[in-house]
Amino acid sequence: MGRGAKTGGLTRAATQAGWKPVALSVTFHYDKGFGPARRRAETASSPGEKTRIMAHVVVVGAGIAGVPAAYSLKAKLGPQDRITVISDRDYFHFVPSNPWVAMGWRKRGDVAFPIGPYLAGRGIDFVCQSLERIAPEANQVHLADGSAVEYDFLLLATGPKPAFGEIEGMGPEGGYTHSILHIEHAVKAFAAYREFLKDPGPIIVGVAQNAATIGPAYEFAFLADADLRRRNMRDQVPITVVTPEPYVGHLGVGGKGETRGLLETALHHHGIAFVCNAKALRVTPGQLHIAQYDADGTVQTAHTLPFAFSVYWPPFRGADALANSPGLADGRGFVTVDEYLRSPGHPNIFAVGLCRAHGVTARTPIPVGPPESVYSIQNDVDTAVANIAAALKGEAPASAAPRRAQWLRDMGETGASYLTAPQIPLRDINWLKEGWWVHMAKVEFEKYFLDKIKLKPAAGSPGWSTHVATALTRRQVQRGGGAAREVPGPAMRPFEVPLERDLSIELKALAKALDVAANTLAGELLNAAILDARLYLSEEVLALTQQVRRELLADGWPEGPADT
């Protein structure tokens, strides 16, 4: 037996992880190479059997990167392995829907919900605490409450920190502009937008230097245009996009040609002005102070733009905890990684999404950040999870390069889809397409992603938050005033649904008790049951269902306007 080994049954940590005591001789080896939580359990009664590894993987962040990463780790690693998610918020929210929240087209509850129960349903631990710092040499993360959590592998998915303080007067807290980077910001922006509608004026949608993922800024400008047209107020509200890009459509990747031309044409068509090569200097009440640069990085002019309402993308930094962890992050607090998304000095630490450092794709006079999207973030997640699993098996890691940029942007009645591959020039693909199908695709993608996060294990039992429970509760509240109601929708087609005799009687009795027509109640319950059914599908079947659904929708759509 090697030095430092322990013998004599399962430890408390192993028991808590679900191991049951058996009559075996078990030897635990503590491997300093990965951390104190990692153990190899070798069973003497199974000669020739492969070594079983118990590992603890900690995921920091419970957003569009962290939660899918935790789900994937739980699926790919062994049942003896432990996954813990740490987040300073107890809820998940779908960030790409924030522009809709800021326009009032979505409510907070539509795209945000407590994440703890969904993690617990998959056997994933959840700690709702802020991260203070990381101690890589000790394989520990230190939390705001003074506690420390040990790990064998650490996956960082914190997202960026909005650095409002780098520009005087910017931001929703103590500043004069709004933000939609977070759901709370978007809710506050919508409240301000409603007040703005009472006394309209110019709107500025801006992007600050060192901001990243700037595509949503254009999206918000087009959504504001669409919303104001619906309200018959567009002629009262000039809209201007202010960007550090050398030209519209650069998007942090140097998009030219088709991308630049289509976006410029779309902005002109919608009457949206734009100012490029603009650096935000400060914001005062109703005034944006900017400097414009030429291609050589020389200031050409400094002036102010008036606004009555503004949404501005701030500079991005890494989370404070990452910046406070020596040897982990660059000068702006982003985690430096190699091509395998590992920290070069700490190969058991991985970083994904916007919390990691990105190389400069295309140099510009004013710094423009990388164009991350849900697609590229999920690519990061897949790579990091696969490499953690490979490390546990003693296999070689796989590279995340070359990467591609791909996203969908809603424009109200239409939308734009952008794809460039690889993300770093020289490129094989670089195009942007517009069409009303993009708007529909983004709606479908939101639905798919939220269903994926809410996916419950097949053995789970329905809770009181199901659609069926909601439908019945609503009917009981409306009892006595429930005249027969047809489900709206021009594409509705009647289905003949066979019911067992007892269930048919049950339906009629329930309908009579609730004072509602039996066919109406049957339709409501069937609609609700179909919605609930999605929660119990495997990820593979859910993805296939969404694909077939899109095909069925496409078959039934009238021919839309041609792509431009």
Model-inferred region functions:
Residues K32, G48, G121-E219, L223-N232, ...:
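FAD-binding core/adjacent interface of flavoenzyme oxidoreductases
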Residues R404, W464, D532-T564:
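Short, positively charged interaction helices/loops
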Residues R82, G121, D125-E137, V141, ...:
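A Rossmann-like FAD-binding core segment of flavoenzymes
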Residues S417-G463:
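C-terminal auxiliary extensions adjacent to catalytic cores
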Residues Y375-A401:
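Internal hydrophobic alpha-helix adjacent to the cofactor/substrate pocket in enzyme cavities
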Residues A55-D125, Q209-V253:
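Beta1-alpha1 glycine-rich phosphate/pyrophosphate-binding loop at the start
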Residues P462-R493, R501-D502, A554-T564:
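A detector of short terminal or domain-flanking linear segments
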Residues A163, P172-L197, P306-I377:
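FAD-site-proximal beta/loop scaffold in flavoenzymes
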